[in-house]
Design a protein with these regions (language model features):
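A binding-site-centric feature that preferentially detects glycan-recognition modules on secreted/surface proteins
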Residues: 1-105, 109-182
């Protein structure tokens, strides 16, 4: 992981570190290396473990949307992450063009799980977030929220707004420098 750590040196972290709903960077393990359902059971927030209403087969049907390039290798870094407070009560279908116009990228299912693994406090009661970069060909969008005090991976319809659900985004993804591997 050392090459990824070194690539954090040039990140602009001025002023954003204390911003609510923000993380400067996280490490994401590619989906070929970790099972999403199992990963949710490893998430812990306020001494309660995460869970998924989707089984592994359903989770594995969700793939990155067109235009989203996931770096090769076992792991990569996601930078400048925002949980989408400005998109609360905006449908995922309406939030996606807004995120893209801001030169940001929506998060994938795996990236969302990684985010709440590193920063479980970013997932709050009545303040979850959609993961717009993972779709499976139907109208569902995966999302993370608190249910019964526990982190939950589920889905919502792409055309429905929720007052408690925003759409997470990032400033970019960075893979390992050429010649490095994990």
């Amino acid at each position: 992981m050392e090459p990824l750590r070194q690539s954090t040196d040039d990140l602009d972290r001025t002023g954003k570190q204390t911003q609510e709903g923000y993380a400067p960077f996280i490490i994401v393990v590619n989906s070929g290396w970790v099972d999403g359902e199992r990963a949710m059971h490893l998430v812990e927030r306020k001494n309660k473990t995460g869970f998924s209403v989707m089984d592994s087969d359903d989770i594995n049907r969700f793939k990155p949307i067109e235009g989203i390039t996931i770096p090769d290798g076992m792991a990569y870094m996601l930078a400048d992450i925002d949980t989408g407070k400005q998109t609360l009560n905006v449908t995922p279908n309406e939030a996606l063009p807004t995120i893209l116009q801001q030169n940001r990228s929506p998060l994938t299912l795996e990236e969302g799980i990684a985010l709440i693994t590193h920063y479980p406090e970013l997932l709050g009661k009545n303040n979850g977030f959609s993961l717009l970069a993972s779709r499976c060909g139907d109208r569902r969008v995966t999302a993370l929220w608190i249910s019964g005090g526990r982190p939950k991976l589920g889905w919502c319809w792409a055309g429905n707004p929720h007052t408690w659900l925003g759409s997470a985004s990032c400033g970019g993804r960075r893979g390992l420098p050429a010649g490095n591997s994990l």
